[in-house]
Amino acid sequence: EQNMADDKLYSRLGQMNMGGIGTAVNLPKAKRYFEKAAKLDNPDALYVLGKLFLRKDSEYYDPNKAVDCLLQAAQKGHEFSAYALGKLFLKGDEVPKNVGCALQWLEEAVVKENQYAEYLLGKTLLMGVDTEQDMERGVQLLTASAGQKNCCAQYTLGKAYLEGVLLPQNIPESIRLLTESADGGFTPAQYLLGKLLYRGEIVMRDIGRALLYLEQASEKENAYAAYLAGKIRLTEEGFKDVPKAVRLFQIAAAQQNSFAEFQLGLLYLRGKDVARDEREAIRWLALSAEHGNSYAARLLHSIKSGQNWSAALGALRLLQHLSRMIQNRLEDERKGTAGMTERKLKRKIDEKKQAHGLRQG
């Protein structure tokens, strides 16, 4: 009983020193307390030590020691250690990849309804990556994880139902799951849902809600969301806010988004919505061109060679319009062949199952 009390006390002291609870953060001291608790077979302490040994920004980084600690904890039934081992062995970045071992430990965690293990194993089985594809079980596990409010699982399932390739397309269920994920703060879901709401092709168009999600994703520096939100703030009547558009473009441009850089260049070049600044315009256009934007390169060439940049811009608008027409046509053709693509994918999956003796009836 004394040992039990001691191991919990040491573990608590370790948490206080690691998290700065009631004292200054002291990682070496925290490590010593966790090691004392681990020697008394405290699985939580072993887990924390394992995670500490995986911190690349720490002087204690040692994947082998991490695996040793996590194994000890997982063998004592610690579900998060089992999940951590499964993830480590599946990725194969810090320890040698071992899919069999990974699946074994993920299954151990799934038995205890660990939402993270349900998500990772479910996604692995749904995609058929590194293991035999099992879409039925993959969906089952992802659904269980999503039911525990796991944003990654909600997003993965929602996207699969949206695309209609791995799973039959189900737009209402897709939007429901993506909304739950976005409302849970998952950035990719916020961007995707915002884009869908803005386009209004498969759900009713709602620019206000679209902006809400896109700007939430922008706050977490999602470049695509920031660029799209910037375009809306720049062009959409009733939502126009040029200073906010500039800030959003700057968020995207900070991550080398060439379209945002191009928009900033245009804004400063035209001097319509912001004060004209040719030097600043050239700086942004040069960055955009450097990052692969051919329109920026052409406009920059026109400016530097003394040509009429306004006429050049008009020509670029025509090129962009033609480009959009071609893109829309290709998209229409893609949608027309979606059913064929699904049938081909299903046939390949059936052939794969037949090869493994798994095809039914």
Residue ranges and their predicted role:
Residues 3-6, 19-21, 40-42, 55-57, ...:
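Short helix-capping/linker turns of helical repeat alpha-solenoids
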Residues 12-19, 48-55, 84-91, 120-127, ...:
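Hydrophobic face of amphipathic alpha-helices that form TPR/SEL1-like repeat modules
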Residues 24-33, 59-69, 96-105, 132-141, ...:
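Structural signature of tandem alpha-helical TPR/SEL1-like repeats
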Residues 36-37, 72-73, 108-109, 144-145, ...:
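Canonical positions in the second alpha-helix
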Residues 152, 171-176, 180-259:
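Eukaryotic tandem repeat interaction scaffolds
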Residues 276-294, 301-308, 314-324:
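TPR/TPR-like (Sel1-like) alpha-helical repeat modules
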Residues 320-361:
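Helical anchoring/docking segments at protein termini
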